[in-house]
């Protein structure tokens, strides 16, 4: 596993951890939880598009997807399956853009 793959796996695991933390904290605010999700997804997108020849356009498209993914996860009460679905939704497209 190369460095980029390790970093992607780390970020995906971090996203799982953020969702687990959300479930454990009843008083966790919507704003804070979504900011955390956005930051992790943003790092994942940045990591995967940094070497892409059209990385600015790729990032714009992926950031729109990131917002939708965050809303999807939140609407499904931060369910594990919803979060994994969002990662799978973004990740295959990231690999195609390279």
Curated annotation (Swiss-Prot):
Pfam families, per database record: Rota_NS6 (PF04866)
Signal peptide extent: none
Mainly localized where? host cell
Give me the disulphide-bonded residues. Answer: none
* Protein keywords: Host cytoplasm, Host mitochondrion
Where found, per UniProt?
Host cytoplasm; Host mitochondrion
Q: Name one GO cellular component term.
A: host cell mitochondrion
For this chain, the family text in UniProt reads: Belongs to the rotavirus A NSP6 family.
Assembly information from the UniProt record: Interacts with NSP2 and NSP5.
Q: What is the name listed in the Swiss-Prot or TrEMBL entry for this protein?
A: Non-structural protein 6
Lineage of producing organism: Viruses, Riboviria, Orthornavirae, Duplornaviricota, Resentoviricetes
């Amino acid at each position: 596993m190369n460095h980029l793959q390790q970093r992607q796996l780390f970020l995906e695991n971090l996203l799982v951890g953020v969702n687990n933390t959300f479930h454990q904290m009843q008083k966790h605010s919507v704003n804070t939880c979504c900011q955390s999700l956005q930051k992790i997804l943003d790092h994942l997108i940045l990591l995967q598009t940094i070497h892409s020849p059209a990385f600015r356009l790729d990032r714009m498209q992926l950031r729109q997807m990131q917002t939708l993914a965050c809303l999807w996860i939140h609407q499904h009460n931060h369910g594990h399956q919803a979060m994994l679905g969002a990662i799978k939704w973004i990740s295959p497209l990231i690999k195609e853009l390279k």
